[in-house]
Amino acid sequence: MTTSLQDGQSAAGRAGAQDSPLAVQVCRVAQGKGDAQDPAQVPGLHALSPASDATRRGAMDRRKAKDLEVQETPSIPNPFPELCCSPLTSVLSAGLFPRSNSRKKQVIKVYSEDETSRALEVPSDVTARDVCQLLILKNHYVDDNSWTLFEHLSHTGVERTVEDHELLTEVLSHWVMEEDNKLYLRKNYAKYEFFKNPMYFFPEHMVSFATEMNGDRSLTQIPQVFLSSNTYPEIHGFLHAKEQGKKSWKKAYFFLRRSGLYFSTKGTSKEPRHLQFFSEFSTSNVYMSLAGKKKHGAPTPYGFCFKPTKAGGPRDLKMLCAEEDQSRMCWVTAIRLLKYGMQLYQNYMHPSQARSACSSQSVSPMRSVSENSLVAMDFSGQKTRVIDNPTEALSVAVEEGLAWRKKGCLRLGNHGSPTAPSQSSAVNMALHRSQPWFHHRISRDEAQQLITRQGPVDGVFLVRDSQSNPRTFVLSMSHGQKIKHFQIIPVEDDGEVFHTLDDGHTKFTDLIQLVEFYQLNKGVLPCKLKHYCARMAV
């Protein structure tokens, strides 16, 4: 009875308020129309307060009554909650499933070194590591943590490594529509190599520690010092810098510190009054120059630059170049460590723990159980046995591979003499072209560029045709941050042609045997062959 009386009073109050000038004035004030007046100064407004309170109490009582009726109704589960049109259910659905609606998809295109491309539809929160993982699984590549995405800016001739944790949507958002920018997938063996062998990346003459740190510091501890929050080494050396708005380059002595990159206005002095700020790296990225001498008139081919994170043209680039590639690698590596810090170390130590967009596309980043359960077996005796020794398993695999190739050569040569020179060379050429490390007819400069792009760490190699000596081959490899070339000489013995690197002391029937031998033995090379350069399609 009380509820009905309150309802009647509130209804009467509403009906009377609709015709009163005071109500019209209050409504205008609430809607922002007319002159804005203080509600306390509107005459007669206090007279409406009791009625409005009664109205609110009546509405609350009605809601409580409805809630009681709902609670008394037997609880029957709804088999189709997504079809329920109740406001309460719609609010719950929106709160329970925000991700499925908010994860927008975006189409990206990734290129390989042979300019083939693949379009991928990825969520907006996908990282560079996620895309690498997806392409590795789709193409059945081996995931050795060296696959890398590169941001290539064609109009300026520069590119950089997209770090594994970076969001691709943020990278692409800084691109300009008119520019021909691309994402490339290729191997970069030097991406985290400085954590393993820092002495190759930080020459002793370019690194100095603070006075309180000098003690027993060695070059092997430089990455740990960079990751420290209270100490840092100082990178210093001569660089050529392009003057803003000019085509000329000026040589100066630079210092890299946590606050940015500085150059000295007076020789090699690092007194504060002689240091001038050049660039910082918190709001900019460091890029490697691919054609600095041709596009920017650089004095050396070992250029790099700073580009603002936000979209900017060629005039916004701060161009630098070093005297040699090892010096450039030192500067770029130190800048990466200062910019990303511990995140870079986490990418190196825990690559599989990064968020993977592959899981959302029903692709597992791990190998299948059947592949992980494979073991090496020996079937040579009366009883089979499992080979537990890894060295023995590797030697057995090599022997089986050699036996398979020998049978293959005999099958290919069954229409003629297997030892005929023409037939043997044709068979060998067919075998060589099937290997990912064989690049056939590429020049010396192209070989050096390919090895440099994939990371000039010790043991990166490829085999190519010799341009100076027909029908011979060249082994190009990296060692000590330098590219070296070794002539593979053909020698004849008892009517058969062999390949050798040491004037016939060690002879091989084909290039596959030669490569496999030097992958296990150093021999006459400066180091073992570890990583091959390959142009793989996506």
From Swiss-Prot:
<feature type="compositionally biased region" description="Basic and acidic residues">
    <location>
        <begin position="54"/>
        <end position="69"/>
    </location>
</feature>
<comment type="similarity">
    <text>Belongs to the GRB7/10/14 family.</text>
</comment>
<keyword id="KW-0597">Phosphoprotein</keyword>
<keyword id="KW-0727">SH2 domain</keyword>
<dbReference type="InterPro" id="IPR036860">
    <property type="entry name" value="SH2_dom_sf"/>
</dbReference>
<dbReference type="GO" id="GO:0060090">
    <property type="term" value="F:molecular adaptor activity"/>
</dbReference>
<dbReference type="GO" id="GO:0005737">
    <property type="term" value="C:cytoplasm"/>
</dbReference>
<protein>
    <recommendedName>
        <fullName>Growth factor receptor-bound protein 14</fullName>
    </recommendedName>
</protein>
<dbReference type="GO" id="GO:0035556">
    <property type="term" value="P:intracellular signal transduction"/>
</dbReference>
<keyword id="KW-0007">Acetylation</keyword>
<feature type="modified residue" description="Phosphoserine">
    <location>
        <position position="370"/>
    </location>
</feature>
<dbReference type="GO" id="GO:0005886">
    <property type="term" value="C:plasma membrane"/>
</dbReference>
<feature type="domain" description="Ras-associating">
    <location>
        <begin position="104"/>
        <end position="190"/>
    </location>
</feature>
<dbReference type="GO" id="GO:0051219">
    <property type="term" value="F:phosphoprotein binding"/>
</dbReference>
<dbReference type="InterPro" id="IPR000980">
    <property type="entry name" value="SH2"/>
</dbReference>
<dbReference type="GO" id="GO:0005768">
    <property type="term" value="C:endosome"/>
</dbReference>
<feature type="modified residue" description="N-acetylthreonine">
    <location>
        <position position="2"/>
    </location>
</feature>
<dbReference type="Pfam" id="PF00017">
    <property type="entry name" value="SH2"/>
</dbReference>
<dbReference type="InterPro" id="IPR000159">
    <property type="entry name" value="RA_dom"/>
</dbReference>
<feature type="region of interest" description="Disordered">
    <location>
        <begin position="1"/>
        <end position="73"/>
    </location>
</feature>
<dbReference type="GO" id="GO:1904145">
    <property type="term" value="P:negative regulation of meiotic cell cycle process involved in oocyte maturation"/>
</dbReference>
<comment type="subunit">
    <text>Interacts with the cytoplasmic domain of the autophosphorylated insulin receptor, through the SH2 domain. Interacts with GRB14 (via BPS domain); this interaction protects the tyrosines in the activation loop on INSR from dephosphorylation. Binds to the ankyrin repeat region of TNKS2 via its N-terminus. Interacts with activated NRAS. Interacts (via SH2 domain) with TEK/TIE2 (tyrosine phosphorylated).</text>
</comment>
<dbReference type="InterPro" id="IPR001849">
    <property type="entry name" value="PH_domain"/>
</dbReference>
<feature type="modified residue" description="Phosphoserine">
    <location>
        <position position="373"/>
    </location>
</feature>
<dbReference type="InterPro" id="IPR039665">
    <property type="entry name" value="PH_APBB1IP"/>
</dbReference>
<dbReference type="InterPro" id="IPR035034">
    <property type="entry name" value="Grb14_SH2"/>
</dbReference>
<dbReference type="GO" id="GO:0046627">
    <property type="term" value="P:negative regulation of insulin receptor signaling pathway"/>
</dbReference>
<dbReference type="GO" id="GO:0030674">
    <property type="term" value="F:protein-macromolecule adaptor activity"/>
</dbReference>
<dbReference type="InterPro" id="IPR011993">
    <property type="entry name" value="PH-like_dom_sf"/>
</dbReference>
<dbReference type="GO" id="GO:0043231">
    <property type="term" value="C:intracellular membrane-bounded organelle"/>
</dbReference>
<feature type="domain" description="PH">
    <location>
        <begin position="232"/>
        <end position="340"/>
    </location>
</feature>
<comment type="function">
    <text>Adapter protein which modulates coupling of cell surface receptor kinases with specific signaling pathways. Binds to, and suppresses signals from, the activated insulin receptor (INSR). Potent inhibitor of insulin-stimulated MAPK3 phosphorylation. Plays a critical role regulating PDPK1 membrane translocation in response to insulin stimulation and serves as an adapter protein to recruit PDPK1 to activated insulin receptor, thus promoting PKB/AKT1 phosphorylation and transduction of the insulin signal.</text>
</comment>
<dbReference type="InterPro" id="IPR039664">
    <property type="entry name" value="GRB/APBB1IP"/>
</dbReference>
<dbReference type="InterPro" id="IPR015042">
    <property type="entry name" value="BPS-dom"/>
</dbReference>
<dbReference type="Pfam" id="PF08947">
    <property type="entry name" value="BPS"/>
</dbReference>
<keyword id="KW-0472">Membrane</keyword>
<dbReference type="InterPro" id="IPR029071">
    <property type="entry name" value="Ubiquitin-like_domsf"/>
</dbReference>
<dbReference type="GO" id="GO:0010008">
    <property type="term" value="C:endosome membrane"/>
</dbReference>
<keyword id="KW-0963">Cytoplasm</keyword>
<keyword id="KW-0967">Endosome</keyword>
<dbReference type="Pfam" id="PF21989">
    <property type="entry name" value="RA_2"/>
</dbReference>
<dbReference type="GO" id="GO:0008286">
    <property type="term" value="P:insulin receptor signaling pathway"/>
</dbReference>
